[in-house]
């Protein structure tokens, strides 16, 4: 397997920008870190990391070509995913802070839920298709898909952990129920805002 070093470095820079900048996954992980802590968010992190790497692999092995051949499918997925993200944004914004005098019935997102979410994550699809098409020549097929999926797994894990840690670090600052509610509303608004650049992609 021969790897193009110039494309490899370019892909690393692309991955840093795409994985670590705010998007639906990162905003939800930040919110979960504040509301549930690092340990309880681990299944959510793992679902995002493995779910997206799997999506990269499947896209590279042929699913991306289906969307290229039938662009209407990508359009349908884009708006269906946007509708689901709006639902999640409302759920986060309206979530009540924990009541210290009652059992906390809230639950963080599960591994399966986070993994399945990748398939309706609009930014995720833009990243997956862009990654596979722009950096297809990083190595010969199918090694190019393996390299991209492996790097996505690595960067996804680092990005997910860093955003959850940011959320947990805010626990000492966002203590009162009013502050938690304001934070959740802000995260819901940011989640909606993250849809704007993706929905305006041609």
Regions found by a protein language model. Give the residues of each.
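Hydrophobic/aromatic residues within the transmembrane alpha-helices of Major Facilitator Superfamily
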Residues: 16, 20, 53-54, 90, ...
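Alpha-helical multi-pass membrane helix bundles of inner-membrane/thylakoid proteins
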Residues: 1-4, 75, 87-126, 172-186, ...
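Transmembrane alpha-helical segments of integral membrane proteins
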Residues: 157-172
């Amino acid at each position: 397997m021969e790897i193009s070093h110039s494309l490899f470095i370019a892909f690393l820079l692309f991955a840093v920008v795409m994985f670590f900048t705010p998007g639906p996954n990162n905003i939800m992980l930040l919110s979960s870190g504040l509301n549930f802590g690092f340990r309880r968010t681990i299944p959510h992190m793992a679902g995002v990391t493995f779910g997206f790497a799997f999506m990269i692999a499947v896209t590279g092995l042929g699913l991306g070509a289906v969307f290229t051949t039938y662009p209407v499918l990508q359009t349908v997925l884009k708006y269906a995913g946007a509708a689901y993200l709006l639902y999640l944004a409302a759920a986060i914004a309206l979530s009540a802070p924990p009541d210290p005098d009652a059992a906390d019935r809230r639950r963080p997102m599960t591994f399966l839920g986070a993994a399945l979410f990748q398939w309706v994550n609009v930014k995720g699809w833009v990243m997956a298709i862009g990654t596979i098409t722009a950096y297809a020549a990083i190595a010969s097929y199918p090694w190019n898909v393996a390299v991209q999926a492996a790097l996505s797994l690595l960067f996804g894990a680092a990005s997910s952990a860093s955003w959850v840690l940011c959320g947990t670090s805010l626990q000492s600052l966002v203590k009162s129920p009013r502050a938690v509610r304001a934070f959740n509303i802000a995260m819901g608004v940011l989640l909606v805002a993250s849809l704007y650049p993706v929905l305006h992609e041609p």
